UniProtKB/Swiss-Prot annotation:
The gene is ileS. Binds 1 zinc ion per subunit. Belongs to the class-I aminoacyl-tRNA synthetase family. IleS type 1 subfamily. ATP binds at K598. This is Isoleucine--tRNA ligase. GO terms for cellular component: cytosol. Zn(2+) binds at C885, C888, C905, C908. Its EC number is 6.1.1.5. IleRS has two distinct active sites: one for aminoacylation and one for editing. The misactivated valine is translocated from the active site to the editing site, which sterically excludes the correctly activated isoleucine. The single editing site contains two valyl binding pockets, one specific for each substrate (Val-AMP or Val-tRNA(Ile)). InterPro entries: aa-tRNA-synth_I_CS (IPR001412), aa-tRNA-synth_Ia (IPR002300), Anticodon_Ile_BEm (IPR033708), Ile-tRNA-ligase (IPR002301), Ile-tRNA-ligase_type1 (IPR023585), Ile-tRNA_ligase (IPR050081), M/V/L/I-tRNA-synth_anticd-bd (IPR013155), Rossmann-like_a/b/a_fold (IPR014729).
Length: 916
């Protein structure tokens, strides 16, 4: 007889190889055909909701790993919440306005000047919608589930109308105003920028020290003294109208070889060193506070203009001279302090950053090129004390990567000052996973200036503002709501297709327009106002959603971006934050922590990972990251992830193979009748389940990744599944011992598949489809396992046993090295007490020790004379006695000797008898 045919070997159609790149699209097609998203919502429609509001990615370009990290974690969250019984809709969104799309069209050869604004905007819209289709397909390929057939898009008429109404409410509250202020201006984009659109890069700049003659000393300083200022923007000197000193700082008039200079005393040594003064030739002649210097008049170095000495709290002693060159047209602090002294705001540059006629001798020069001309003129006037060059961190346009300037222009602003404290209070009421997240957004709101919401572009939502014949601003509830209604019906392009009069309510009149003529604003809104209105345009308008959202989750750059603009508009109009909980993730770097770039050849993109390895590998990688900080990815890291995936898959496959003849309805053993080892594993499963559920609740996916591996490797592979082979393959099919183990194996398989489902979405579905007797059609329509109390006493007892078993394994390994045995079934374990542990008494509580140790024989004694002492006993390994059973390979002294049952142990004889 071929005894192999009598073994109950694992049977399953679940393949060992994942073949994910080919299999996943088939699973996704099945989900779409089955309308799984709709069914998941339907299942929980009467339950409490959980709303994760999607921050809209920009509809331009292919997905990068940051997109994948973001969308996959969102999918973890929403799928988990759904399996916990929450009504958890997920509405993906896209941000569609702004300069990058205008630039993309220009690169494609679209000439803006050859068409109307409305026609160009139509092309922008077509481009954005095509980009959305591409990104949508790629997001779905990552296994992300959501309402992709009905996403929110910031260019749709209903969204734009909601944005206009929100703007109108802010205007009603006096939070929208027009003013001439210095704002970040990008000559390369020819537009103003918000703080969120600024990034810092190193830039080489001129560093100059300039002397300003005293014109009117007011009897405080010598009339032949000079104030020294320091600046890295020589091109702003033509706009200088003041020198700012700190009222409480001490200043000195220093005589240096007959020249008299005024600087802050705390900076005198640094200035002396910078200007190369001989220390022995420096004399402090006079001392005064900054307050005493107020209203002294200096002379502009080359213009017929007074430079007034004023006081400002923003002056520091970190660098420079303590006498700050002040040009209100080119600096926020300068502007604010200038307002107090009613200083003129001079800003002689055009939109391209070129000097206008107001710039005098510099007319027609690009501001950066004017640096040399200004410096040369200062030198000619003997006002230049030092010219040097420094490399420093400087603001750049985040899209064009070109330097920006501060430039005073007429702009529209949303007031932060009026709602700042309310926003800070709302942040206090918001929950954060990490304290630094709260600190970060709190400090940004606390320190930010007024929000410039106007942009001098065409692809965006128009500012719904009209002007009367006399220049009066018209921005009333009636006019704004009328524009909103028009946008909702026709889209915002109507603003560029119709005259102002046609966009106003019928019969509208205004005292400032006696002839009934009106003009309309040509600026559009900052794109951060677009996405920052999503709580109104999406949460409050989609019937399946609600305000405020339970969670906003985006990259950490959104503390200054979407998180910031959203809470500003929500607090301004609704008096509360649009989110209850705020969570962020870091950026994706290469394997060495460097930024990915084509030049370094270290770029990995989602499409490549999905095609080569599969979306589940990308998702498992995401779960393996500490996403709160920057994360790393490389081919080597993905290879390690694939190895972990293979281990998980093979473990699930082993369990599937060994429950193929098990029906939980008819074959399950009641928990009280399970073998104790099986009850131990059931309790370990419950511990693992409770920990995993807790980790999902706290968004701790790295913990899940590590604990899944630990449970699979330590509890299952290294012990239970290995121990179980002797039972599952060898015992009689429906023996109590085998059914007891299958009962627990089935439970482990079901629960593990559910617990892995939010992460390994495709693999979990595949496992589910191969699992016999499951009730739900999809694992994603099932519920998470319930958290159940564990038997602490049982766990404590078996945890001690597992430690003892580790000692036995060490002894077996030693015996293997010494060639006493080969495989562990060739061993007889002799074990007894040591000085610290009563091994013999402890082991009396356990049956079938030879199976638990995976050896042929175990002898427990009080004392083992020739044993090696381990923590849990003295152990001696001998070769097993007797001969090897040809069916189970255990050694015994009771082999059968006749007929069919020859060379079988008594247990195998009993089993085979029933098969013959």
């Amino acid at each position: 007889m071929n005894y192999k045919d009598t073994l109950l070997m694992p049977k399953t159609d679940f393949p060992m190889r994942g073949g994910l790149p080919n299999k996943e699209p088939q699973i996704q097609e099945m989900w779409d055909n089955d309308e799984q998203y709709r069914k998941a919502l339907e299942k929980n429609k009467n339950n409490p909701s959980f709303i994760l509001h999607d921050g809209p990615p920009y509809a331009n370009g292919n997905l990068h790993m940051g997109h994948a990290l973001n969308k996959i974690i969102k999918d973890f969250i929403v799928r988990y919440k759904t399996m916990q019984g929450f009504y958890a809709p997920y509405v993906p969104g896209w941000d569609t306005h702004g300069l990058p799309i205008e630039q993309a069209l220009t690169k494609k050869g679209v000439d803006r000047k050859k068409m109307s604004v409305a026609e160009f905007r139509e092309k922008c819209k077509e481009f954005a919608l095509k980009q959305i289709d591409i990104q949508k397909k790629d997001f779905k390929r990552l296994g992300v589930r959501g309402d992709f057939n009905n996403p929110y898009i910031t260019l749709t008429p209903e969204y734009e109308a909601a944005q206009i109404r929100l703007f109108g409410e802010m205007a009603d509250k006096g939070l929208i105003y027009k003013g001439k202020k210095p704002v970040y201006w990008s000559p390369s984009s020819e537009s103003s920028l918000a703080e969120a659109e600024i990034e810092y890069h190193d830039k080489r700049s001129a560093s100059i020290y300039v002397a300003f003659d005293v014109k009117d000393s007011k009897g405080k300083v010598d009339s032949d003294a000079q104030f020294i200022i320091w600046t890295t923007t020589p091109w702003t000197i033509p706009s200088n109208v003041a020198i700012t000193v700190h009222p409480e700082l001490n200043y000195g008039q220093y005589n240096v070889n007959g020249h008299k200079y005024i600087v802050a005393q705390a900076l005198s040594e640094a200035v002396a060193e910078a200007l190369g003064w001989d220390k022995d030739s420096i004399q402090l002649e006079k001392e005064f506070t900054g307050k005493e210097l107020e209203f002294v008049e200096a002379q502009h170095p080359f213009l017929d203009r007074v430079s007034l000495v004023i006081n400002g709290e923003h002056v520091t002693t970190d660098a420079g001279t303590g006498c700050v060159h002040t040009a209100p047209g080119h600096g926020e602090d300068d502007y604010i302090v200038g307002q107090k002294y009613d200083l003129p705001v001079i800003s002689p540059l055009n939109d391209k950053g070129v000097f206008t006629e107001e710039g005098g001798p510099f007319e027609g020069m690009f501001y950066d090129k004017a640096n040399k001309a200004v410096t040369d003129l200062l030198k000619e006037k003997d006002a230049l004390l030092k010219l040097d060059f420094i490399t420093h961190s400087y603001p750049h346009d985040w899209r064009t990567k070109k330097p920006v300037i501060f430039r005073a222009t007429p702009q529209w602003f949303a007031s932060i000052n009026k709602v700042r404290q309310d926003i800070l209070d709302a942040i206090e009421d918001t929950n954060f996973k990490v304290d630094w997240g709260k600190t970060r957004i709190y400090n940004m709101i606390r320190d930010r200036g007024e929000w410039v919401i106007s942009r001098q572009r065409v692809w965006g939502v128009p500012l719904p503002v009209f002007y009367a014949e006399n220049g009066d601003i018209i921005m009333t509830k009636e006019t704004v709501n009328h524009v909103a209604d028009l946008f909702e019906k026709y889209g915002s392009n109507i603003w560029f297709e119709k005259e102002a009069k046609e966009l106003l309510p019928e019969g509208f009149s205004h005292p400032g327009s006696p002839n009934g003529e009106f003009t309309k604003e040509t600026d559009i809104m900052d794109v951060w106002f677009d996405s920052g209105s999503s709580h109104r345009g999406v949460l409050e308008t989609r019937p399946e959603l609600s305000f405020p959202a339970d969670l906003y989750f985006e990259g950490s750059d959104q503390y200054r971006g979407w998180f910031n603009s959203s809470i500003t508009t929500a607090v301004a109009t609704r008096g509360q934050a649009p989110y209850k909980f705020l969570l962020s993730h870091g950026f994706v770097m290469d394997g060495e922590g460097k930024k990915m770039s084509k030049s370094l050849g270290n770029v990995i993109v989602p499409d490549q990972v999905v095609k080569q390895k599969g979306a589940d590998i990308a998702r498992l990688w995401v779960s393996s990251t500490d996403y709160l900080s920057d994360v790393r990815i490389s081919d080597e890291i993905l290879k390690q992830t694939s190895d972990v995936y293979r281990k998980i898959r093979n473990t699930l496959r082993f369990m599937l193979g060994n429950i193929n003849d098990f029906n939980p309805e008819t074959d399950s053993i009641a928990e009280t009748n399970l073998l104790e080892v099986d009850r131990y594993l059931l309790n370990r499963l419950r511990e693992f389940t409770a920990s995993t559920i807790n980790n999902y609740e706290n968004f701790d996916y790295l913990n899940i990744y590590q604990e899944v591996q630990n449970f699979i490797n330590v509890e299952l592979s290294n012990f239970y599944l290995d121990y179980g082979k002797d039972i599952l393959y060898i015992e009689k099919k429906d023996s109590h011992k085998r059914r007891s183990m299958q009962t627990v194996l089935y439970q482990i398989l079901i629960d593990m598949t559910k617990l892995l489902a939010p992460i390994l979405v495709h693999t979990a579905e595949e496992v589910w489809s191969h699992t016999p007797h499951v009730k739900e059609e999809s694992v994603h329509l099932s519920d998470m396992p319930k958290v159940v109390d564990v038997d602490e006493e049982l766990l404590e007892k078996w945890n001690t046993f597992m430690n003892l078993r580790d000692d036995v394994n060490r002894a077996l390994e030693q015996a293997r090295n010494e060639k006493v045995i080969g495989k562990s079934l060739e061993a007889k374990v002799v074990i007894g007490n040591n000085e610290t542990f009563n091994t013999a008494e402890f082991l009396q509580q356990f049956n079938d020790l030879q199976q638990l140790f995976i050896v042929s024989q175990v002898e427990v004694k009080d004392k083992v004379n020739d044993g090696v002492s381990y923590q849990y006993g003295d152990i001696h390994i001998k070769h097993a006695e007797g001969e090897k059973c040809e069916r189970c390979w255990n050694y015994t002294e009771e082999l059968g000797s006749v007929g069919e049952l020859e060379h079988l142990c008594p247990r195998c004889q009993e089993v085979v008898k029933t098969l013959v």
